Amino acid sequence: MTASQDFVVKDISLADWGRKELDIAETEMPGLMAAREEFGKSQPLKGARISGSLHMTIQTAVLIETLKVLGAEVRWASCNIFSTQDHAAAAIAATGTPVFAVKGETLEEYWTYTDQIFQWPDGEPSNMILDDGGDATMYILIGARAEAGEDVLSNPQSEEEEVLFAQIKKRMAATPGFFTKQRAAIKGVTEETTTGVNRLYQLQKKGLLPFPAINVNDSVTKSKFDNKYGCKESLVDGIRRGTDVMMAGKVAVVCGYGDVGKGSAQSLAGAGARVKVTEVDPICALQAAMDGFEVVTLDDAASTADIVVTTTGNKDVITIDHMRKMKDMCIVGNIGHFDNEIQVAALRNLKWTNVKPQVDLIEFPDGKRLILLSEGRLLNLGNATGHPSFVMSASFTNQVLGQIELFTRTDAYKNEVYVLPKHLDEKVARLHLDKLGAKLTVLSEEQAAYIGVTPQGPFKSEHYRY
């Protein structure tokens, strides 16, 4: 990257290919295209300086261009070292949008690129964050605490934290006061995924959230669609591209039965696998059992599994002891946001053979081997291309509405975590019905009055679970 080249991509010559796929994706993303039509003239994001940290895919490229059509300035990095589609990054960089994303980044590159989304040419700060997993948000908040004299950088708990803390120290030395100034300038953050939302709620509980946040993940049109139907298609896609294994008849264990786990279990069952589920939550466990899945512990199931996938958002779900029990050539992967669901660090002293990008064969001293996908990071994005465009349109339309809401109505929000109101959730769903040829029934005035709603909605209470 030079002063005249404010981007880092693998190969800018891939831009034409990326543009062709981007044009196709637009036809599958009616929510984002409707947002351009509705808000393009009014420019509600004019003046917004958005730092985006979200998988740099073709679908994300459509989101970025939508934000720009609505008036925003944007700088972008991927939120995962393996999830970038290099042709998508090139297509966006070729339009003049600063993007810092390469498939297969080192951790050092990842945190350098995260830093770059806050480095505007005029030296002024960002005023909005669009996040997926919370890394961009945490980068600023941890840095600001360090500048305030708190001892937050001296005891890293992982290799990732070592690299993160080193990058924070580097920026503090280069630009004193940077993090404090940047934190004060943020009007709000919109967060895409369960893991990042959990981080925000923890900050709120401790009184450490310095700006409002919108929890996009828990919009119904995100969690019940992206998390479930998206994983239902992309999980098996990633396993197939990574291994070419036939799943029919295999024993697959899905760790977790939240929305992502439900989609993952259905994905594997649809491919013919015999699916078992592990759960800590009795409600989710009962759902799994009544959906026809055997509910087991991983301690019991590890030795018979052909495929094991984590979906929980928690850490140490698959331990080194579990992996020692697994059969030869068991496939191990994760579709939760971070790589700590699997104790990958405990495997580093074993023999690793790279089969192809994001596929590693790991050999134990007794000769038993495991196939690890994407080094324990998101296999649907590392080994494949993530969720289909249509389902991401719903998620990303929520992101656009959240950005507009926080940027234009900042004073209406306290420094807390919010969910988009029901009428906007229903609006997002409505925008996607025509593409599927679906026709809504319309309540009469009498019917609406009988159940206490209007014929236009909202049709459900805020606590309705769907």
Curated annotation (Swiss-Prot):
Pathway: Amino-acid biosynthesis; L-homocysteine biosynthesis; L-homocysteine from S-adenosyl-L-homocysteine: step 1/1
An example Gene Ontology molecular-function term: adenosylhomocysteinase activity
A biological process from GO: S-adenosylmethionine cycle
Catalytic reaction equation(s): S-adenosyl-L-homocysteine + H2O = L-homocysteine + adenosine
SUPFAM superfamilies: Formate/glycerate dehydrogenase catalytic domain-like, NAD(P)-binding Rossmann-fold domains
Enzyme Commission identifier(s): 3.13.2.1
Cofactor: NAD(+)
Gene Ontology CC terms, in alphabetical order: cytosol
Keyword vocabulary terms for this entry: Cytoplasm, Hydrolase, NAD, One-carbon metabolism
Binding site for NAD(+): 193-195, 227, 256-261, 279, 314, 335-337, 380
HAMAP family, A to Z: AdoHcyase
Family, per entry: Belongs to the adenosylhomocysteinase family.
Record-given protein name: Adenosylhomocysteinase
Species of the source: Brucella abortus (strain 2308)
